[in-house]
UniProtKB/Swiss-Prot annotation:
Gene responsible for this protein: psaA
UniProt-listed Enzyme Commission number(s): 1.97.1.12
Function in brief: PsaA and PsaB bind P700, the primary electron donor of photosystem I (PSI), as well as the electron acceptors A0, A1 and FX. PSI is a plastocyanin/cytochrome c6-ferredoxin oxidoreductase, converting photonic excitation into a charge separation, which transfers an electron from the donor P700 chlorophyll pair to the spectroscopically characterized acceptors A0, A1, FX, FA and FB in turn. Oxidized P700 is reduced on the lumenal side of the thylakoid membrane by plastocyanin or cytochrome c6.
Keywords, in A-Z order: 4Fe-4S, Chlorophyll, Chromophore, Electron transport, Iron, Iron-sulfur, Magnesium, Membrane, Metal-binding, Oxidoreductase, Photosynthesis, Photosystem I, Thylakoid, Transmembrane, Transmembrane helix, Transport
GO CC terms of this entry: photosystem I; plasma membrane-derived thylakoid membrane
Cofactor binding annotation: PSI electron transfer chain: 5 chlorophyll a, 1 chlorophyll a', 2 phylloquinones and 3 4Fe-4S clusters. PSI core antenna: 90 chlorophyll a, 22 carotenoids, 3 phospholipids and 1 galactolipid. P700 is a chlorophyll a/chlorophyll a' dimer, A0 is one or more chlorophyll a, A1 is one or both phylloquinones and FX is a shared 4Fe-4S iron-sulfur center.
Reactions catalysed: reduced [plastocyanin] + hnu + oxidized [2Fe-2S]-[ferredoxin] = oxidized [plastocyanin] + reduced [2Fe-2S]-[ferredoxin]
GO biological process: photosynthesis
An annotated Gene Ontology molecular function: oxidoreductase activity
Residues annotated for [4Fe-4S] cluster binding in this entry: 590, 599
UniProt subunit comment: The PsaA/B heterodimer binds the P700 chlorophyll special pair and subsequent electron acceptors. PSI consists of a core antenna complex that captures photons, and an electron transfer chain that converts photonic excitation into a charge separation. The cyanobacterial PSI reaction center is composed of one copy each of PsaA,B,C,D,E,F,I,J,K,L,M and X, and forms trimeric complexes.
Keyword Zinc-finger found: no
The protein, known as: Photosystem I P700 chlorophyll a apoprotein A1
Length: 767
């Protein structure tokens, strides 16, 4: 910790400026008001593309960093308003169109639904039998499981949440207008990182987690304990009354009665006194460290989750008191950064992290790049935890939801990480001043970029040739009828020994790292099979040769994605081919006439290519997950305890050839979507075809050149002129960059929607 000099202590002056900047629709209603050229109105059809490209590119509106910061800040409130409206819609559907109460009464037999299709021209066929007499569309978002975990017991509570979320949306919209048009923060407020860290860590994460712990302890714990007892067929008694159904459960506010909640958790009887006297063991019945999962619901123990949030709250409240603001104590981020000088042997950057503080507080693109990389990685980590440590009741046996949440969080993470590279490249072009970064860490990385990229390229070639080589070998041997010469568990075995060792460490650690834990951290690490309602909720995930092979395909595709994105960032400002890239900007088609071979070299083009490889990588990941779980984990548990897996364990023998992936995964599991017509999953059949069409449509933009279209358009304009119906706005072909943008958007949209329909139609039928 560093003690600040006295002059740093007086920063308590107002950091908000009163502005009179009326929010007038006269201005907003004028298209392109933010750009002098666009405000003149359209002369050619290119105008509408430029309008969309620049509407949110605040850097292009003004070079005033304070004004840009205020626009971003205001836009965040608008974004939050949209999120609250979206949440309200989810709550409203749960309140008005769902079988939530029916699902709560029998979660192992009733399927969740929150949408009922009205008959217009026969689409009521989409309403499937959800059980308990309810007809609707099955949802796979996991909302019912989350709501049960919160302690929501009826639709009235959901309607209250729907109304509350709309009120919050209104407040957010109001805040967005107020903090731009009436009282706007000054630039120094946006750059006051210590204050921001203190408030976000202690307030948002610390007090937020503490508040959530309060809800979990006082509402979720008693409510879910009563529901679990009902589901287990052993209802509990409260005040002499048997709680035999969800309707009998007391309302949340009734649990503020200490005597009532103490009948479920005696620790509540100790009151707040035990906290101040240090007798924390009195609370050990509701702040637990059990480990494993609840055998009734197949989810983590609610008392473990409450304990976790309490620990998080304590950590973050402490963390939120570490940074120096108006008082002369605490850390200064600038001083911490400037104290890092780099290892003289491994990384000889004599200036270390000098200049980084200024770069990160004046380049919001740089800051956003870091944040997107972190958040994207976090989303991918969430995807893994949804099945390994299921947090919500009965979610583990809702296989469509499990596949849906895994796929969703993987793709969200992928898009955010590509976005991180995009904004890092924009930061390098618009915000990086080489004169301010001499021999610091950024400068050293840029000086070493040839070594970094060529090594990464070598790694990609090695991984690609070897991982694909294993598959080519196996396909050849199987084609020639020589199974004994294949890489497989039963022939030439290549076991993933490192991964198996890590599984073993996690399985064995439970007794030593957490002495009082009753079970390991997750059943996937050599654990036992947990059955809920006759279905597998969690089980050990055995790894073999097939996993070793596909994991190296993962390594290959991820490294290629990183190669493309990192090359885009490191060569954003200049390269041997185009030394003046920084002057050409983030996106440009080619380096002008007479410079052949310089097309598709901009930082934007690297993001464009990175998106395809991100999609490539994650398609293999979600296919691997989907097939592996159906083959080796998910299934029904027979009376004798044996498990009938959905695809009968065919992964180990089929996933070791390319032909096996095509035949036993893609083709075999497409049976449901291809044969869905005439059934309640027929919408997925239509989506499957429609999304294929959108995907194919993208190829038209990706495979053809701009000149072809310009030539075609000119002949069409000639025909219009002949008929005297020529438009006032001159039609022009899309630019190369615009065409590629339209192409990649439809490629990803078509690919993702195709995969969605393929997964859903299959798992809704067999899962």
């Amino acid at each position: 910790m560093t003690i600040s000099p006295p002059e740093r202590g007086s920063t308590a002056k107002s950091q908000v400026e009163k502005v009179d900047n009326p929010a007038t629709f006269e201005l907003f209603g004028k298209p392109g008001h933010f750009d002098r050229a666009l405000a003149k109105g359209p002369k050619t059809t290119t105008w509408v593309w430029n309008l969309h490209a620049n509407a949110h590119d605040f850097d292009s509106h003004t070079s005033d960093l304070e004004e840009v910061s205020r626009k971003i800040f205001s836009a965040h409130f608008g974004h939050l308003a949209v999120i609250f409206i979206w949440l309200s819609g989810a709550f409203f559907h749960g309140a008005r169109f769902s079988n939530f109460s029916g699902w709560l009464a029998d979660p192992t037999h009733v399927k969740p639904s929150a949408q009922v299709v009205w008959p217009v021209f026969g689409q009521e066929i989409l309403n499937g039998d959800m059980g308990a007499g309810f007809q609707g569309i099955q949802i796979t978002s996991g909302l019912f499981h989350v709501w049960r975990a919160w302690g929501i017991t009826n639709e009235t509570q959901l309607m209250s949440l729907a109304i509350g979320a709309l009120v919050m949306a209104g407040l957010m919209l109001n805040a967005g207008v107020f903090h731009y048009h009436k009282a706007a923060p000054k630039l120094e407020w946006f750059q006051n990182v210590e204050s921001m860290l203190n408030h976000h860590l202690a307030g948002l994460l610390g007090l937020g987690s503490l508040s959530w712990t309060g809800h979990l302890l006082h509402v979720s714990l008693p409510t879910t304990k009563l529901m679990d007892a009902i589901d287990a067929g052993q209802p509990l008694v409260l005040n002499g009354k048997t709680i035999a159904s969800v309707a009998d459960i007391p309302l949340p506010h009734e649990f503020f009665n200490q005597d009532l909640i103490a009948q479920l958790y005696p620790g509540f009887g100790a009151g707040i006194g035990a906290f101040f006297s240090g007798d924390w063991a009195a609370y050990s019945d509701f702040l637990t460290f059990k480990g494993g999962i609840n055998p009734v619901t197949g989810s983590m123990w609610m008392s473990d989750i409450a304990h976790h949030h309490l620990a998080i709250a304590v950590l973050f409240i402490v963390a939120g008191h570490m940074y120096r603001t108006n008082w002369g104590i605490g850390h200064s981020i600038k001083e911490i950064l400037e104290g890092q000088k780099g290892d003289p042997l491994l990384f000889p950057a004599t200036k270390g992290h000098d200049g980084l503080f200024e770069f990160m507080t004046t380049s919001w693109h740089a800051q956003l790049g870091v944040n997107l990389a972190m958040l994207g990685s976090l989303s991918i980590i969430v995807a893994q935890h949804m099945y390994a440590m299921p947090p919500y009741p009965y979610m583990a046996i809702d296989y469509p939801t499990q596949i849906g949440l895994f796929t969703h969080h993987m793709w969200i993470g992928g898009f955010l990480i590509v976005g991180a590279a995009a904004h890092a490249a924009i930061a390098m072009i618009r915000d990086y001043d080489p004169a301010k970064h001499v021999d610091n860490v950024l400068d050293r990385v840029l000086k070493a970029r040839d070594a970094i990229i060529s090594h990464l390229n070598w790694v990609c070639i090695w991984l690609g040739a070897h991982s694909f080589g294993l598959y080519v070998h196996n396909d050849t041997m199987r084609a020639l009828g020589r199974p004994q010469d294949m890489f497989s568990d039963s022939a030439i075995s290549i076991q993933p020994v490192f991964a198996q060792w890590i599984q073993g460490i996690h399985a064995g650690a439970a007794g030593s790292t957490a002495p009082n834990a009753l079970a390991g951290v997750s059943e996937v690490f050599n654990g036992s099979t947990i059955a809920v309602g006759g279905k597998v909720a969690a089980a050990a995930i055995p790894l073999g040769t097939a996993d070793f092979m596909v994991h190296h395909i993962h390594a290959f595709t991820i490294h290629v994605t990183v190669l493309i994105l990192l090359k885009g960032v490191l060569y954003a400002r200049s390269s041997r081919l185009v030394p003046d890239k920084a002057n050409l900007g983030f996106r440009f088609p080619c380096d002008g006439p007479g410079r052949g071979g310089t097309c598709q070299v901009s930082a934007w083009d690297h993001v464009f290519l990175g998106l395809f490889w991100m999609y490539n990588s994650l398609s293999v990941v979600i296919f691997h997950f989907s097939w592996k779980m159906q083959s080796d984990v998910w299934g029904t548990v027979n009376a004798d305890g044996s498990v009938q897996h959905i695809t009968n364990g065919n992964f180990a023998n089929s996933a070791i050839t390319i032909n096996g992936w095509l035949r036993d995964f893609l083709w075999a599991q497409a049976a449901q979507v291809i044969n869905s017509y005439g059934s309640n999953t027929s919408a997925y059949g239509l989506m499957f075809l429609g999304a294929h069409f959108v995907w194919a449509f993208s190829l038209m933009f990706l495979f053809s050149g701009r000149g072809y279209w310009q030539e075609l358009i000119e002949s069409i304009v000639w025909a219009h002129n002949k008929l005297k119906v020529a438009p006032a706005i001159q039609p022009r072909a899309l630019s190369i960059t615009q065409g590629r943008a339209v192409g990649v958007a439809h490629y990803l949209l078509g690919g993702i929607a195709t995969t969605w329909a393929f997964f859903h139609a299959h798992i809704l039928v067999v899962g």
